[in-house]
């Protein structure tokens, strides 16, 4: 855990926000989906870093950049040294340098989509060629 805390402190700029979500109100398996449904409060130019009490992961999400404040959900600006996980809360930290990292993430997602489309086109062409061969073969017989 010390490495993660050090990595967190070293990697963060003074502008750091912490969003708390009471995990008793959320199915933890659907945490990202739950967070991504929350909207209306925008943190511009920031990368979300999500800390769970039992672990750590980082996820770039467009929807996570918009937040709706509710009784169970609140946001606060925090000092650099307090950017660490909380015991019964999910803490979402945002750090600067969102723009490039998120653009890269979007490009990767677009690349994946393009590869899927290209693969679908290739398969469709193969099926079409097979049908043409079958049609020609049946005409010749």
Where are these regions (language model features)?
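Short, low-order "capping/linker" segments at domain edges
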Residues: 62-64, 85-109
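Short glycine-/aliphatic-rich beta-strand segments at the starts of folded cytosolic domains
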Residues: 11-21
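Periodic self-assembly scaffolds
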Residues: 108-135
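Short, flexible beta-strand-to-coil junctions
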Residues: 19-26, 53
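Short, flexible, solvent-exposed loop/turn segments with mixed acidic/basic and small polar residues
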Residues: 2-12, 36-43
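Short, conserved charged micro-motifs
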Residues: 25-32, 57-63
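Short acidic DE-rich linear segments
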Residues: 135-141
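Short, intrinsically disordered low-complexity segments
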Residues: 40-86
